[in-house]
């Protein structure tokens, strides 16, 4: 059941820690519509202010927007603002985290490795299909299951 898997994904990503209950309910509803009626999902996302009426909209874009708009997702462009990333990760990890351009050199694997070395968390890469840098934070113990669920649900979440 895709809805049950999506619920499990939200739980494993510790979504309740970051997102208000009403928005969790909203993303669950949108995900159900995404699987039933893509046009109805589009209408609801426009009504909620998640997308604009003139945006090209397909299933892949809808899934990316659900992640971007409703999950605790770091969003940046390819240049990465390291002050912003450090702030985001410090809040998510509930401890001070700092990485510099010199350490990371815009390489996701280096950032992920440092997060794993300094905490019980890891990072998951969100494939935007362009040169943006999006990532999710999750407990190391949940990474494998999150990737399995993302594969089943065809969500753009990778190691």
What residue ranges belong to the model's regions?
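N-terminal "domain-start" segment
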Residues: 1-91
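Glycine-centered secondary-structure boundary/capping sites
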Residues: 10-14, 35, 98, 119-123, ...
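Surface-exposed, low-hydrophobicity interaction/linker segments
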Residues: 65-124
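Acidic, proline/glycine-rich low-complexity IDRs
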Residues: 110-159
């Amino acid at each position: 059941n895709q809805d049950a898997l999506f619920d499990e994904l939200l739980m494993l990503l510790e979504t309740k820690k970051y997102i208000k209950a009403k928005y969790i309910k909203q993303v669950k509803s949108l995900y159900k519509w995404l699987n039933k009626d893509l046009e109805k999902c589009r209408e609801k996302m426009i009504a909620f202010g998640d997308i604009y009426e003139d945006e090209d909209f397909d299933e892949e874009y809808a899934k990316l927007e659900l992640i971007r708009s409703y999950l605790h997702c770091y969003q940046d462009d390819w240049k990465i603002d390291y002050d912003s990333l450090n702030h985001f990760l410090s809040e998510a990890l509930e401890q001070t985290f700092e990485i510099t351009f010199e350490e990371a050199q815009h390489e996701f694997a280096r950032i992920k490795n440092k997060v794993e070395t300094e905490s019980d968390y890891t990072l998951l890469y969100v494939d935007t299909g362009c040169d943006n840098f999006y990532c999710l934070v999750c407990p190391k113990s949940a990474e494998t299951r999150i990737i399995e669920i993302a594969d089943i649900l065809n969500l753009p979440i990778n190691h």
